[in-house]
From Swiss-Prot:
This is Receptor-like protein 49. Residues 32-803 are extracellular. Gene3D superfamilies: Ribonuclease Inhibitor (3.80.10.10). It is found in: Cell membrane. Residues 1-31 form the signal peptide. One of its GO terms (cellular component) is plasma membrane. Disulfide bonds: none annotated. Residues 825-844 are cytoplasmic. SMART domains: LRR_TYP (SM00369). Keywords: Cell membrane, Glycoprotein, Leucine-rich repeat, Membrane, Receptor, Repeat, Signal, Transmembrane, Transmembrane helix. It comes from Arabidopsis thaliana. InterPro entries: Leu-rich_rpt, Leu-rich_rpt_typical-subtyp, LRR_dom_sf, LRR_N_plant-typ, LRR_R13L4/SHOC2-like. Belongs to the RLP family.
């Protein structure tokens, strides 16, 4: 088709207009998605305050495309910021440019641990931060989980009236939850777990009618005070009002009381966790009538009875944990749980069970805990549990051999049969190797004896076989367990040396305590992953393996009662997580401090070097860097194997041996340097260790005075300074230590009266004997008899007489002195000074 010139021009114009229109639309659309300049500037300022680890945060690009940034497509305002777990570096301050983003609706800053990290100077008070966040009035979602925030929650947080999700868990706040939290009318999720809150929880939380998930776990809520949520009536009244709740977690507080019988009114409840409290009475049957309930955790309380009632076959309950309560001795038939057809996890430990031969549990059950259930026969119904993954039948009265069919269960991977009376295994020597993917086996505290069982080579991670009767050398077949990370063979009769093939293992935990093992501990047997080494009460000789210095995660070293001959292992200070050192009863020698040593053990909790041959003087600042003993707040490292096994150590407190297991290490802090040859003054810096519970410096050669500053050790329960060469008096300030139950100052050179304070006077007289100069109760020696008292009275009378004569003499000399003074004054002022001075000069 042919077009005229005019038509061609018209077509060109039309196409040009169309192109311009399209381009203008594109430009408008492009411009529409650019965030506003003030929003970009605020974000860029925030980036400059921290190191935001993203290459997309560039100043010449659309900030709405930056990682973690969401914008309103209509206004260009930033409405969402998600930088959770971004390793933001630096304290978030209350004047941060972040708070200029006034249109924010979602803010995720969780797991950035530097926000309130060090102190009130270079960190951030959580209260200040939340006060600033309280001005972001459009916020709907706020997550500051695990940011190391501290301080008090401000009431301004209640200004966030649009908030639906609030997560402040895993921080270090103080005080109580503010009443204003009840103003968050649209709140659906409230997570305040592990925040160190205490006391009253506001009843205003009962106003949160939309609340679906409530987590107040791992705090310190009690029933103290008339308005406290710890008062169970208040607690349940508030909870029962919130009929939208699906998740309730009140675990690990100090709540007390009884659960109400009408718990079924929480008809939407799916998850109910109250473990680790002090609830008592009966577990009401109404809990099992909630049709939506999926998980129920009531462990570690004081419940005494269980009311199951009629359980609907429509029950959705999958997890039921009842262990660790104080159930009465009435026998409960295991078959009452049979109607729970969806049950996959059942813990009934501590309940006196009847298990009939015909009992059957739901086939989907995967985790079964029957510990301490007074079972005397291996449960035969387990043979049909083809989905069983983990079995715990520890602490019962089962005798005989472990049945062969147990190892044929196809899904079984974790078995705990400890604390029974098993004496062997049915079937061939390799019967356990037929157990598929078995990764955890605990056969401790039985009466097993040789031969040691053959184990699955590829899957075994955790092996516990302590407190049995195994003997001979440690079997080299253990070295074939390539994936083994925990090996506990304590309290057997193993002898010989540690197999050198242990170098093939990558152990985190190696415990061989109380055997008859001997020889030099091989350097190559130390895995650089080692966190806990316990070889106490054996016959090892030689030196400590220096390869321990490569174990950067080492926390626990226990070598008590061996024949190890070495100098003090000061190189252990290089291990950043080191906490427990027990060298007691060996042949260590020499000084425990040398010039140039810093001996900075910031995390050390237990220091026991007693009964060795250490010598030398400790400088006054020796204990200054030991910060874990001077502060309550101290990070506790969590391990992937936590729950499988706990370290233990035997210590002396108040004259008695006591065993610390597991969490006892977090609160128990002790120093024992007794039975050595240390000398010089007791270091003043020891008074900085305010969390110290036991201090034993007895049977050394310490001299000088007892530091009065020991009265700063406000948590001290036991003090032993006996059998030294200490002189001077017993400081009366020690009587201010209200927890000090035992003290011993005997066999020193102390003198003077024993302080007459309650804490000191309650001690036995043997705590003060063999100090010739000490007197007063509880010793029979009085501080001065009758003759001495008479002499003292005579001295006082003589002193009084001398004072009287002095005053008389002063009075006699007073009058002529005044006359003489007046005469001399008259001479001086009457211009006869030269004559007077000439006369004076004749006598000088």
């Amino acid at each position: 088709m042919m077009y005229s010139c005019r038509e061609r021009r018209m077509i060109t114009v039309k196409w040009s207009l169309c192109l311009i229109f399209c381009l203008s639309n594109s430009i408008l659309v492009f411009a529409k998605h650019l965030c506003l300049p003030d929003q970009r500037d605020s974000l860029w300022g925030f980036k400059n305050e921290f190191h935001v680890p993203s290459e997309k945060w560039r100043n010449n690009t659309d900030c709405c495309s930056w990682d973690g940034v969401s914008c309103d497509p209509k206004t260009g305002n930033v409405v969402g910021l998600d930088l959770a777990g971004s390793d933001l570096n630096g304290p978030l301050r209350s004047n941060s440019s972040l708070f200029r983003l006034q249109h924010l609706q979602k803010l995720y800053l969780g797991c950035n641990t530097s926000f309130g990290s060090l102190s009130y100077n270079d960190g951030l008070k959580g209260g200040e931060l939340l006060d600033s966040i309280g001005n972001l009035k459009y916020l709907k979602v706020l997550s500051l989980r695990g940011c190391n925030l501290f301080g008090k929650i401000p009431s301004s947080l209640g200004n966030l009236s649009y908030l639906t999700h609030l997560d402040l868990s895993f921080n270090d706040f103080t005080g109580v939850i503010p009443d204003s939290m009840g103003n968050l009318n649209y709140l659906r999720v409230l997570n305040l777990g592990k925040c160190n809150f205490y006391g009253k929880v506001p009843s205003s939380l009962g106003n949160l009618s939309y609340l679906a998930q409530l987590d107040l776990s791992y705090n310190d809520f009690t029933r103290e005070g008339p308005d406290s949520m710890g008062n169970l009536n208040r607690l349940t009244d508030m909870l029962l009002k919130l009929n939208s709740l699906t998740d309730i977690d009140l675990g690990s507080n100090q709540l007390k009381g009884m659960l109400p019988s009408n718990m079924s009114s929480l008809s939407k409840l799916e998850y109910f966790y109250i473990g680790g409290n002090s609830f008592s009475g009966s577990i009401p049957s109404s809990l099992f009538m909630i049709p939506s309930l999926v998980e129920l955790d009531l462990q570690r309380n004081h419940f005494s009875a269980l009311e199951i009632g009629n359980i609907s076959s429509q029950s959705k309950l999958q997890v039921l944990i009842l262990g660790g309560n104080n159930f009465n001795p009435d026998i409960v038939d295991l078959s009452i749980f049979s109607p729970l057809l969806s049950l996959g996890y059942l813990d009934v430990s501590g309940i006196n069970l009847k298990i009939s031969s015909t009992v059957s549990l739901p086939s989907p059950i995967e985790y079964l805990v029957l510990s301490s259930c007074n079972i005397s026969e291996f449960p035969k119904f387990l043979r049909n549990q083809t989905k069983l993954y983990s079995l715990d039948i520890s602490a019962n009265q089962i005798e005989g051999q472990v049945p062969e069919w147990l190892w044929s269960l196809p899904e079984l991977q974790s078995i705990n049969i400890s604390h029974n009376s098993f004496n062997g295994f049915e079937g061939p020597a390799d019967v356990i190797q037929g157990g598929g993917e078995l990764y955890m086996l605990d056969i401790s505290s039985n009466i097993f004896q040789d031969p040691f069982p053959l184990l699955p080579v590829d899957s075994m991670n955790f092996l516990f076989s302590s407190n049995n009767r195994f003997s001979g050398e440690i079997p080299k077949t253990i070295c074939e367990l390539d994936n083994l990370v925990m090996l506990v063979l304590s309290n057997n009769n193993f002898s010989g040396s540690i197999p050198r093939c242990f170098e093939n293992l990558h152990l985190y935990v190696l415990h061989l305590r109380n055997n008859n093992l001997s020889g030099i501990f091989p350097e190559e047997a130390i895995s650089d992953r080692l966190q806990s080494l316990d070889v106490g009460h054996n016959l090892f000789s030689g030196e400590l393996p220096k390869s321990l210095i490569n174990c950067s995660a080492l926390e626990f070293l226990y070598v008590e009662d061996n024949r190890i001959s070495d100098t003090f292992p000061s190189w252990l200070e290089l291990l950043p997580n080191f906490q427990i050192l027990v060298l007691r009863s060996n042949e260590f020698y020499g000084p425990i401090f040398s010039p140039g040593d810093s001996l900075s053990f910031p995390r050390l909790r237990i220091f026991d070097i007693s009964e060795n041959r250490f010598t030398g003087v400790l400088p006054s600042d020796y204990f200054a860097p030991w910060s874990a003993m001077s502060s309550v707040v101290d990070r506790i490292i969590q391990h992937f194997f936590q729950g499988y096994y706990h370290n233990s150590v035997v210590l002396t407190n108040k004259g008695l041996n006591m065993e610390l297991v597991g969490s006892g290490f977090t609160i128990y802090k002790t120093i024992d340097v007794s039975g050595n040859r240390l000398e010089g003054d007791i270091p003043e810096s020891i008074s900085l260790l305010k969390e110290l519970i036991v201090l034993n410096m007895s049977n050394n050669a310490f001299t000088g005075h007892i530091p009065p500053s020991l009265s700063n050790l406000s948590n001290l329960q036991s003090l032993d300074l006996s059998q030294n060469r200490l002189s001077g008096s017993i400081p009366g300030e020690l009587g201010e230590l209200t927890f000090l139950a035992r003290m011993n100052f005997s066999y020193n050179r102390l003198e003077g009266p024993i302080p007459q304070t309650t804490q000191i006077q309650t001690q036995d007289s043997s705590s003060f004997t063999e100090n010739p100069g000490l007197c007063g109760l509880p010793l029979k020696k009085n501080c001065g008899g009758k003759e001495e008292a008479t002499k003292q009275e005579q001295d006082e009378e003589k002193e009084e007489e001398e004072q009287v004569f002095s005053w008389i003499a002063a009075a006699i000399g007073y009058v002529p002195g005044v006359v003489c003074g007046l005469t001399i004054g008259h001479i001086l002022v009457s211009h006869k000074r030269d004559w007077f001075m000439r006369i004076v000069s004749l006598f000088t």
